[in-house]
Amino acid sequence: MFPDLAADLKAAMPDLRGRLLGNEPLAPLTWFRVGGPAQVLFTPADEDDLGYFLSLLPAEVPVLCIGVGSNLIVRDGGLPGVVIRLAPRGFGEARSDGETVHAGAAALDKRVAETAAAAQLGGLEFYFGIPGTIGGALRMNAGANGRETRDVLIDATAVDRAGRRHVIDLAGMQFSYRSSGADPSLIFTSARFRGTPASPDAIRAKMNEVQAHRELAQPIREKTGGSTFKNPPGHSAWKLIDAAGCRGLRIGGAQVSEMHCNFLINIGDATAADIETLGETVRERVKAQSGIELQWEIKRIGVTAGIAG
């Protein structure tokens, strides 16, 4: 348990409309279903509410924004400070306007692909197979099937730690492979994407292909977090992991997927420490076998058990 911060924040922010909770479990909000609590969990009502909250939040309080937790390990000791979770009700918009698709940061990537398809706009089909939200896609330049967020983004809207709103163009996002160089303290709230007119049949065929690939090649019905490690230049992470003999490797309740060995899975009773230790063991074995050091793609946040409180 962390010291109670939520009560003090509520008292200092009488006009807050969103939901503010103290020592709130985060495990149910992640795909791995592991991890400790947030000292404060804030779900803003909308962008104005988020700006109000940040404008009054003491500068020394750490802040982290999460989406649906599909690419996240929350450590067992939880997270000190404030965790902000953007909910679909205030940030889940997905609509088309001509050749532009507007999406809130809490909109599922899959929904954005479907919105584009309904408007007969191609180019965003790759989002159909990414199990996250647009906020996460902006932060990590999410991509699949040879396409990335930087290929379709027009601009993004974000709120800074002072509660001020910014519009960031494509160049300002400073995208690279699975990364953005934009200020890490910014919280993305929405984005605009450019589609290309295409036939409905062609769009649907690409989306079906994406889904079929996921069904056949990825453990999508397990408690997992998606691709664990980035592909090193010129290599596939899963091939390096397989060559190092890590397919099926298990530590505690965590296991390297037999189906796709760049996926770690919670086989029922894993702790965050089990999953992270397994990942580090994989990295060590790959380095020893190939000389290549894998880099985590999954974000690991929080403190280890026993540190909090």
Curated annotation (Swiss-Prot):
Pfam families: FAD_binding_4, MurB_C. One of its GO terms (molecular function) is FAD binding. Its cofactor is FAD. Residues 33-198 form the FAD-binding PCMH-type domain. It comes from the Bacteria. It catalyses: UDP-N-acetyl-alpha-D-muramate + NADP(+) = UDP-N-acetyl-3-O-(1-carboxyvinyl)-alpha-D-glucosamine + NADPH + H(+). GO terms for cellular component: cytosol. InterPro entries: FAD-bd_PCMH (IPR016166), FAD-bd_PCMH-like_sf (IPR036318), FAD-bd_PCMH_sub1 (IPR016167), FAD-bd_PCMH_sub2 (IPR016169), MurB (IPR003170), MurB_C (IPR011601), MurB_C_sf (IPR036635), Oxid_FAD_bind_N (IPR006094). The keyword Lipoprotein does not apply. The active site is at residues 178, 227, 297. It is found in: Cytoplasm. The keyword Oxidoreductase applies. Keywords: Cell cycle, Cell division, Cell shape, Cell wall biogenesis/degradation, Cytoplasm, FAD, Flavoprotein, NADP, Oxidoreductase, Peptidoglycan synthesis. SUPFAM superfamilies: FAD-binding/transporter-associated domain-like, Uridine diphospho-N-Acetylenolpyruvylglucosamine reductase, MurB, C-terminal domain. Coiled coil: none annotated. Its main location: cytoplasm. Signal peptide: none annotated. Its EC number is 1.3.1.98. Pathway: Cell wall biogenesis; peptidoglycan biosynthesis. GO terms for biological process: cell division; cell wall organization; peptidoglycan biosynthetic process; regulation of cell shape. Cell wall formation. This is UDP-N-acetylenolpyruvoylglucosamine reductase. It comes from Rhodopseudomonas palustris (strain HaA2). The gene is murB.
